[in-house]
């Protein structure tokens, strides 16, 4: 695949959890271009988190094709794919386990075998990218919820990912940290797929929205068009973003 090709390409993706008769995902087709910020929205249980887990090999697809930077999703390609794709969990605490912020951010680059001087340089750069360089020597437990989210992102940025996946990144953030996160995400060069119930956050962060309903893609297009279509959102059991609600 050439450099101009999609970072992520999936076609006719299906997944059903063991013991269930109705698939969570039924024929999902989606591609993401380099640098594109895409919001993944839909009601509870529609398969947003499941889809993210399929993209990093936590779950295995049962039908369809999936490629990341031209690499097919196969066991032998998993290590290479995970180096290209960062995954931010909803609970940032699950990704932060070292004694200081700098140690946590450096962990991924160390784990991939970069020499110490390059690990240090990548760590400094990543901390600066998310504006928490002043927290480098701080114990993780002293960070706010927003700072923990940024530390998780910084750790992934040390590997220069082509794509970052995020599951409910604005959850539990106060307004200031929420605005800060939006600004930082909009300034990053990599592609993103952001799953969220917070449609205002998606509107501010993403240029494109993919709407899931009953395991399928119900709509895929510019954020401004989809997130202002009250009839479409209502058919998928969603409400308009707060900024577009009247009364």
What function would you assign to each model-found segment?
Residues 117-135:
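Conserved ABC ATPase "signature" region
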Residues 196-197:
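H-loop/switch region of ABC-family ATPase nucleotide-binding domains
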Residues 202-204:
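A short, surface-exposed alpha-helical micro-motif characterized by mixed small hydrophobic
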Residues 139-143, 147:
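Conserved ABC ATPase signature
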Residues 56:
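Helix-to-loop junction immediately C-terminal to a conserved catalytic motif
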Residues 216-239:
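Conserved beta-strand-loop-alpha-helix hinge in the C-terminal portion
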Residues 64-72, 81:
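Conserved ABC transporter NBD signature motif
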């Amino acid at each position: 695949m050439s450099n101009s090709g999609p970072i992520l390409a999936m076609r006719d993706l299906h997944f059903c959890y063991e013991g269930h008769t109705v698939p969570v995902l039924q024929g999902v087709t989606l591609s993401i271009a380099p640098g594109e910020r895409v919001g993944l929205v839909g009601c509870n249980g529609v398969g947003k988190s499941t889809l993210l887990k399929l993209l990093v090999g936590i779950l295995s697809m049962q039908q369809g094709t999936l490629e990341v930077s031209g690499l097919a999703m196969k066991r032998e390609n998993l290590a290479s794919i995970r180096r290209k794709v960062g995954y931010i969990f909803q609970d940032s605490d699950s990704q932060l386990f070292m004694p200081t912020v700098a140690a946590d951010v450096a962990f991924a680059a160390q784990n991939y075998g970069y020499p110490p001087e390059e690990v240090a340089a990548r760590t400094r750069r990543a901390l600066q990218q998310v504006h928490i360089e002043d927290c480098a020597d701080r114990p993780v437990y002293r960070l706010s919820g927003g700072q923990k989210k940024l530390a998780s992102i910084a750790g992934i940025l040390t590997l220069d990912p082509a794509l970052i996946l995020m599951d409910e990144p604005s959850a539990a953030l106060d307004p200031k940290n929420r605005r800060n996160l939006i600004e930082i995400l909009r300034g990053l060069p990599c592609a993103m797929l952001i799953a969220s119930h917070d449609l205002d956050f998606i509107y501010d962060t993403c240029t494109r929205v993919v709407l899931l309903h009953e395991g399928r893609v119900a709509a895929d297009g510019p954020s401004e068009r989809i997130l202002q279509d009250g009839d479409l959102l209502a058919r998928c059991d969603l409400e308009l973003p707060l900024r577009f609600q009247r009364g």
